[in-house]
Design a protein with these regions (language model features):
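Ribokinase/PfkB-type carbohydrate-kinase core domain
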Residues: 2-8, 62-64, 70-74, 88-215
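Alpha-helix N-cap/helix-start motif
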Residues: 19, 56, 156, 175, ...
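Short glycine/threonine-rich catalytic loop with a Thr-x-Gly-x-Asp
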Residues: 25-26, 30, 214-220
Length: 220
């Protein structure tokens, strides 16, 4: 029987609080990645910091229900990160962000031992990866990282050389040129999501394109 690949997502989490409905949902890039990976048949764990409030329980309980390992989540006295979100014409609009206990997050020695068991470690730009991704990389652990549209953030310069696969959100022209420039910063493979234009990847030799799947959007 084939072994399930094991992914550990590390970094930010938050409660996405929708102001119109006054409802909160688990969110954060690494949180979402861990859930998607289990949906695809892999094993996943999440490492990050949550507070001792209802938001922390929401994050942990939600991940458990999706079969994500939460054994290395740090529960810290204080508030869980919260993003307030509005819906306008069917699109999400991010209003403000309170980082809460994630502001001081970094990985522990116990976390590092756990990360060494992973086939891949993934992170995102809001999770203070500059504090620990260089060490993860130096230990030879395969890494992927989502820079969103913050690839010129000062922290990104520290992380680029430590990443095998880099993801970006990009809405400018000449996506191919953009991926070439990003790959020069260190990653072996660069992937840009392009909204309605799908996505594009570049491995230094060839470009790969993927379109979108049209779907009906409920604008209520």
């Amino acid at each position: 029987m084939n072994r399930q690949p094991f992914l550990v997502a590390v970094g930010d989490n938050c409660v996405d609080y929708y102001v119109q409905t006054r409802t909160g949902y688990p969110g954060g890039n690494p949180v979402n990645v861990s859930v998607y990976f289990t949906r695809l048949g892999g094993r996943a764990a999440y490492i990050g910091a949550v507070g001792t409030d209802e938001g922390g329980a929401l994050i942990c309980d939600g991940l458990r229900r999706k079969n994500v390992d939460v054994s290395h989540i740090h529960t810290v006295q204080g508030r869980t990160a919260v993003t307030r979100v509005a819906l306008r014409d069917g699109d999400r609009v991010f209003l403000d962000y309170n980082e809460g206990v994630m502001a001081d997050f970094t990985v522990t020695e116990a976390d590092m031992d756990f990360l060494r068991t992973a086939d891949m470690v993934v992170g995102g730009i809001s999770g203070h990866g500059e504090r620990y991704f260089p060490r993860i990389h130096s230990d030879g652990i395969p890494t992927a990282f989502d820079f969103s549209d913050e690839y010129d953030d000062p922290a990104a310069a520290t992380i680029f050389p430590c990443v095998e696969v880099a993801f970006f959100s990009y809405d400018g022209g000449d996506a191919a040129g953009f991926l070439r420039r990003m790959r020069e910063r260190g990653p072996a493979v660069c992937v840009a999501t392009l909204g309605a234009d799908g996505s594009m990847a570049y491995d230094g030799q060839q470009f790969y394109r993927q379109g979108i799947v049209p779907c009906q959007v409920d604008r209520k």
